[in-house]
Amino acid sequence: MNIDLQAREITPLRNTYDHVARHIGGDKVASRYQEATYGAQPMVNFHYRPTWDPGHELFDASRSKIVLADWYVLKDPRQFYYATWTMTRAKQQDAMEANFQFVEQRGMVGKMPDGVREKALTVLMPLRHAAWGANMNNASICAYGYGTAFTAPAMFHAMDNLGVAQYLTRLGLVLGEPQSLEDGKQAWLDAPEWQGLRRLVEDSFVVSDPFELFVAQNFALDGLLYPLIYGGFVDDHV
């Protein structure tokens, strides 16, 4: 019995979806990021207005004072959509696991000076709660924002901040056992030096404009906190 295999070229009828083509200037080959992002925002045929906010549709651009002529003019330079984001974070998770394993297997925590360990715990453990606040705020931006190019990265960043909180938790368990987490919580609640940051984080929970919250959390707060803590403190003083 002979089997004759022949290659045949199949020409696609179109290169991408119509709703994507409208944003990239015609029927061109679109990237995965473009197909996962452009035109994905629900705009019509909602079943009902939310009972807790009858003044708005489920997805409503009027929740923000900032209104864009094109909601997809915002673009992620990393081209993250769900698949590329998860693959990138998985590789970073593997690297972090290797770092923790390297430290734990060699007993390097026990070789740290007590002063350095205490300083790290005193400064970093309360920041678990700031990272949790950033997670909440970016989840809110995703829930109430408009335009997938704006809301999808906010959800990725929400989960990134949850990861930061988890890494700080693990660091606390490695350096100081469970009591260090409780000490960090009490410092966040009661220590005078943390109350300004805590007030800012908690006040941001009631900001209803997604763009205002985006600027407050991701530009102002993170823009000051990350260089101060993970640059100035961790790199220069620990």
Task: Identify the residue ranges that each predicted region occupies.
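Terminal targeting/low-complexity segments that flank the catalytic cores of oxidoreductases
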Residues: 1-130
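Alpha-helical bundle segments that constitute or directly flank the non-heme di-iron/ferroxidase center
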Residues: 44, 48, 114-145, 208-236
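His/Met- and acidic-residue-enriched segments that coordinate or traffic transition-metal cofactors
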Residues: 80-81, 139, 166, 227
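Charged/polar, solvent-exposed surface patches and flexible loops
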Residues: 83, 87-90, 94, 98, ...
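Acidic/His metal-coordination segments adjacent to aromatic residues that form catalytic metal sites
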Residues: 102-123, 184-219
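Long, hydrophobic, well-ordered secondary-structure blocks that form the structural core
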Residues: 114-115, 121-196
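Short helix/strand-bridging catalytic loops that position acidic/His residues to coordinate divalent metals
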Residues: 156, 236-238
